[in-house]
C-alpha cells in the first residue's frame, strides 16, 4: 500500500500550491484526475500491481526469481534425491526462461510413498506462485477423488478438457498437478494429449506456457532395483545417473496395466519431457527429515528422540534393511507422540 500512496503523492505534488490560486471545483477535478491517473499507472505497471494482487507468471517480470526460489527450497528441504534436484531445477528454470517454447512442460515423478513427490510438486508451485497450491493458477487433481468411477470416464474426459482449456485461456502459465496416476483409469489422461502436443494454437488458445506434473507410485520397483544394484556393487546412490533409470522407467510405466499411463499416447508420442525417479530413502535421510520437522516447529532437537523415530521405521529388503518403506511420510505423526507440542 505504501507504494500506491507514494505514486499518488507524486501525482499530486503539482497541485500543492496556495489555495487562492486554484478554484475549488478545478482543484477537485484535478485531484480526481490525478488519483485516476495514479491508479491507471498502478494497474499498468506489472511489478507494482503484482505486489498487491496475484498475477499469472506470464505477466510478471520476475520469472528468474521463481527459478532461484525453486533451487533454494530443494537444496534446503529435499533429501537423498540428487536426480530430482538436478533435473527439476534445470527443466523448470529452462522452461520459464524460454520465450519460445514449442510445447508445455510435462514432468512425471515416480517413486514409493514418502520419497518426496508431493513435496516437490508443492515446492514447484510455491516457487512460481506465492500462494502455492492455493493459487488460482495452480490446479491439483487426485485420481481417487476427482475421477473415482470407471463408468464415468467419458464425462471426466470432457470435464478435464474444459477445465484445462478455460484456465489456460485465463492464464497461459497455469500449473496442473495430477496425483495418484497409478490409480487413474487407463485412457483418461489421453484426453489431455492435444494440450501437451506441439500445436501453436488450439481453438485460438496456446498451451505452450503451461506446466503439467504427474505423480505416481508406478515404476517404484524398477527404481529400487537399480538402486539396489548400485548398492550391491559397492557404488553410492549419488553415482546413479538419469540415463541409468529413465528409459527403463518409462517402459515400465507404459506397460503397467495398473497405471493411468498404461499404453498412453502421452508416452507413445514422447510428450512427457522427463520421467524423474525418486530413489527410496535410507536411514540417514529419515533422520534428516525428522531434524528438519522438529526445527520447523521451533523446538530444540533431541538427538535421542530423533534416533528413536528413525529406528522405529520399517526398512526393506528384509535382510539388508536399507530403505524406509514409508520414506518420511509418518515422521509428522511420530513427532506428535514424542514431543509435547
What are these regions (language model features)?
Residues 165-166, 186-213, 217-221, 226-240:
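Conserved catalytic/switch belt of AAA+ P-loop NTPases
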Residues 2-5, 16-38, 122-126, 277-341:
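C-terminal alpha-helical "lid" subdomain
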Amino acid at each position: 500500500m505504501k507504494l500506491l500512496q507514494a505514486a499518488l503523492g507524486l501525482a499530486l505534488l503539482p497541485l500543492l500550491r496556495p489555495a487562492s490560486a486554484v478554484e475549488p471545483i478545478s482543484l477537485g477535478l484535478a485531484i480526481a484526475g490525478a488519483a485516476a491517473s495514479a491508479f491507471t499507472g498502478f494497474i499498468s505497471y506489472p511489478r507494482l500491481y503484482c505486489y498487491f494482487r496475484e498475477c499469472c507468471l506470464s505477466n510478471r517480470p520476475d520469472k528468474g526469481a521463481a527459478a532461484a526460489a525453486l533451487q533454494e527450497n530443494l537444496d534446503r528441504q529435499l533429501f537423498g534425491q540428487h536426480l530430482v534436484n538436478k533435473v527439476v531445477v534445470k527443466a523448470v528454470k529452462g522452461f520459464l526462461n524460454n520465450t519460445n517454447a514449442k510445447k508445455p512442460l510435462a514432468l512425471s515423478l515416480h517413486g514409493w510413498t514418502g520419497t518426496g513427490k508431493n513435496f516437490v510438486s508443492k515446492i514447484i508451485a510455491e516457487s512460481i506462485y506465492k500462494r502455492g497450491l492455493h493459487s488460482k493458477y495452480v490446479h491439483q487433481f487426485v485420481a481417487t477423488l476427482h475421477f473415482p468411477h470407471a463408468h464415468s470416464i467419458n464425462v471426466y474426459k470432457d470435464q478435464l478438457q474444459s477445465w484445462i482449456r478455460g484456465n489456460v485461456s485465463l492464464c497461459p502459465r497455469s500449473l496442473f498437478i495430477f496425483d495418484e496416476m497409478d490409480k487413474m483409469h487407463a485412457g483418461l489422461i489421453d484426453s489431455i494429449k492435444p494440450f501437451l502436443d506441439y500445436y501453436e494454437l488450439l481453438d485460438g488458445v496456446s498451451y505452450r506456457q503451461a506446466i503439467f506434473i504427474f505423480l505416481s507410485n508406478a515404476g517404484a520397483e524398477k527404481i529400487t532395483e537399480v538402486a539396489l544394484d548400485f548398492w550391491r556393487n559397492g557404488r553410492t546412490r549419488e553415482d546413479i545417473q538419469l540415463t541409468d533409470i529413465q528409459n527403463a522407467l518409462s517402459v515400465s510405466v507404459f506397460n503397467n496395466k495398473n497405471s493411468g499411463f498404461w499404453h498412453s499416447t502421452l508416452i507413445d508420442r514422447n510428450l512427457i519431457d522427463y520421467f524423474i525417479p525418486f530413489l527410496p530413502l535410507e536411514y540417514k535421510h529419515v533422520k534428516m527429515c525428522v531434524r528438519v520437522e522438529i526445527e520447523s516447529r521451533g523446538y530444540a532437537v533431541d538427538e535421542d528422540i530423533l534416533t528413536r523415530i528413525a529406528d522405529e521405521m520399517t526398512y526393506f529388503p528384509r535382510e539388508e534393511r536399507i530403505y524406509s518403506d514409508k520414506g518420511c511420510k509418518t515422521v509428522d505423526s511420530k513427532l506428535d507422540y514424542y514431543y509435547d507440542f
